[in-house]
Amino acid sequence: MAIIDRTSAPLSPSYGTNALNRTSFPKGFIFGAASSAYQEDVSIMKGMGLDAYRFSISWSRVLPRGKLSGGVNEEGIKYYNNLIDELQANGLDSYVTLFHWDVPQALDEEYGGFLNPKIVNDFRDYADLCFQRFGDRVKRWITLNEPWTFAVTGYDDGSCAPSRCSDWRQNNCTGGDSGLEPYIVTHNQILAHAAAVDVYKKKYQATQNGLIGITLVTKWMVAASNSSVDRRAAQRAQDFFLGWYMDPLTTGDYCRTMRSLVGNRLPKFTAQQAKLIKGSMDFLGLNYYTAQFAVDKSSSNGVNQSYTTDSHATLLINCNESVSGELNGVPIGEKVWHICILATSEVYLTTKLTFCGLISKLHTLPSIEHQAGSNWLYVYPKGVRLLLHYIRKKYNNPIIYITENGIDEVSNSTLPLHDVLTDNFRVMYYRRHLSYIQRTIKEGVDVRGFFAWSIFDNFEWNSGYTSRFGVNYVDFKDGLKRYPKLSAQWFKVFLQK
């Protein structure tokens, strides 16, 4: 469990904004935030100076039975219309995700959800309805959010709904096959994505003048050693992670690495499907938080097949070969920050105590942990630059939006409010990632926008309310009152026009 020392003096809300701010990015670059928000929260976003808000539409909120034949819930349509109108009235663009893992229960019960190709047409119809009802005001559509996460946590390790996995995993799953179902689910997600894009381009894009894409979760894979086997393992890990989706979207088929290692368990696209899938995005959304070490495990005996083991690469948080960001006790990101204060009261944060000696004869405050509240999130800002260049070179430099980036902390109700709001670590996280993103733009990567995760503390899947990613604090015990953290104040200064 990460411990964040909040005894350190808070940074200034203007920390580092003279050197890096909105004007450091190209004209028209979009700054936004994402999470779940109420209509009345729009004024908070406007006050911060944001350009856009990214949110998802709940499939079953507008189609309770999952299908058009089951009827449209006009109250659900009204809810989203009101939110979109409120955003528009306050000068905020809507970036809308169509699927964020919430399969309508009726479709799961009828035919198994994304395990069945029938879902492709139902998703297409749902998307068509959304384009028809909201597309006059929504100019950026995202078909799927993190299809990898949905496929792997739902059908390989079973940690999320619908909690399916092989018996040998002993995760108390509801049935499943970890070596087969993740590939079927991803295959149908890709086909559903392409079907929705096809409808939008044929029926709506010319008149609504919007763009449509997909958001993928990403990590930078770092070889655990300089050995050739570990370097190849890092590439295999990336092929199975990012390439699982990007290769079909850019070439019409899965990469050779996956074809070789997964064999006939990996579904095949027909010639017509491949044609529909190839190039089926106007932009690419990337969710980037962290990086991981990759270690070769090509000696696996293959008895217990699963997506996780098929790549023959182990992704290392501690030296015990669990899902990890540490190798032999060495974290992948700089883990400890030191705060140095100059005579001018200017504050510097550094991972090297020697740096404090170079810039100041004053004191160094106690170090603070740099690992996030989530044990999977080690901070590795330069990974975003390496990843963006990798995509530029391998996948023809697509238009990119960073659709999620952020860091959490463990919720601690015993802390005074002032301490809770002093999130120096989050300010540093955002500033360093934005600095690398700005650098990659200058180097030729076509990044068009950045969305912080998240605008408010919210319900974080398996972590519930115990994990806080928000730049605005939500008091869950006192009427959901909102309080701006230091990071929200920093963004307000950063975004000034």
Segments (PLM) and residue ranges:
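Active-site region of glycoside hydrolase catalytic domains
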Residues: 2-39, 65-67, 74-497
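Conserved catalytic and ligand/cofactor-coordination microenvironments
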Residues: 45-59, 84, 97-99, 118-119
